[in-house]
Amino acid sequence: MLAKRIIPCLDVADGRVKKGVNFVNLTDVGDPVAIAAAYQQQGADELVFLDIAATNEHRETMAAMVEQVSAQVFMPLTIGGGITSVADMQRILRAGADKTAINSAAVANPELIRAGAEKFGNQCIVVAIDAAWDAAAGQYRVYTHGGQQATDLDAVAWAKQAVALGAGELLVTSMDRDGTKAGFDTKLYQALGATVNVPIIASGGAGNLQDFVDVFSTTPVDGALAASVFHFGELTIADVKATLRKQGVVVR
């Protein structure tokens, strides 16, 4: 039984963490290295950094930040945002990231998944999917550009295609739940888990300890990602893991 992963997510622009992280002993709420080190101490299994500014001039800044973080922190790092080519992937992986996450660029050019997987291995390629329920169509619809643009893609079908092209992991955000603290969209992850055989990370909706228990006990996801509940100390990773252990969920 593989241990389930608890993964904080940090939004970064210009090499700074943008949603202030409210740890008690943090002097600089925007310093990615200090925040990553604090999360490592708390027992996070991985970290995801999303470059929300992601323009050409920010890419070098992002690589420099990854170098600094990876020199100090010894847990897997996934970097997403603005990665649109194999060269972008290479820059981030060389800087010390373990995985690169691609979202809009993969929808626009699915062959980018295959090219990245062939060059770096499937385990380095995470396809991030933003999905929202479309009641009229009776399916989860894929959105791109930070959730701004609807596509014609069905999220479950797109997940299957992404894996066939070489995605080694899926990071799937429920736009319906994101920021609501109403719990993870278990129906979405059940549908995905029945279709693909790579690790799935659930994102969007974490609000309390029971939400983590529910997503791991009712869906086959391998990891759960959250941002604000961890950043503002509403939940600690230690509490999440202790609760999961009590419920028989295997965690690191």
From Swiss-Prot:
GO terms for molecular function: imidazoleglycerol-phosphate synthase activity; lyase activity. The active site is at 11, 130. SUPFAM superfamilies: Ribulose-phoshate binding barrel. Pathway: Amino-acid biosynthesis; L-histidine biosynthesis; L-histidine from 5-phospho-alpha-D-ribose 1-diphosphate: step 5/9. InterPro entries: Aldolase_TIM, His_biosynth, HisF, IGPS_HisA/HisF, RibuloseP-bd_barrel. Its EC number is 4.3.2.10. The keyword Amino-acid biosynthesis applies. It is found in: Cytoplasm. It catalyses: 5-[(5-phospho-1-deoxy-D-ribulos-1-ylimino)methylamino]-1-(5-phospho-beta-D-ribosyl)imidazole-4-carboxamide + L-glutamine = D-erythro-1-(imidazol-4-yl)glycerol 3-phosphate + 5-amino-1-(5-phospho-beta-D-ribosyl)imidazole-4-carboxamide + L-glutamate + H(+). Keywords: Amino-acid biosynthesis, Cytoplasm, Histidine biosynthesis, Lyase. GO terms for cellular component: cytoplasm. Its main location: cytoplasm. One of its GO terms (biological process) is L-histidine biosynthetic process. Heterodimer of HisH and HisF. Belongs to the HisA/HisF family. PANTHER family: IMIDAZOLE GLYCEROL PHOSPHATE SYNTHASE HISHF (PTHR21235:SF2), IMIDAZOLE GLYCEROL PHOSPHATE SYNTHASE SUBUNIT HISF/H IGP SYNTHASE SUBUNIT HISF/H (PTHR21235). IGPS catalyzes the conversion of PRFAR and glutamine to IGP, AICAR and glutamate. The HisF subunit catalyzes the cyclization activity that produces IGP and AICAR from PRFAR using the ammonia provided by the HisH subunit. This is Imidazole glycerol phosphate synthase subunit HisF. It comes from Lactiplantibacillus plantarum (strain ATCC BAA-793 / NCIMB 8826 / WCFS1) (Lactobacillus plantarum). The gene is hisF.
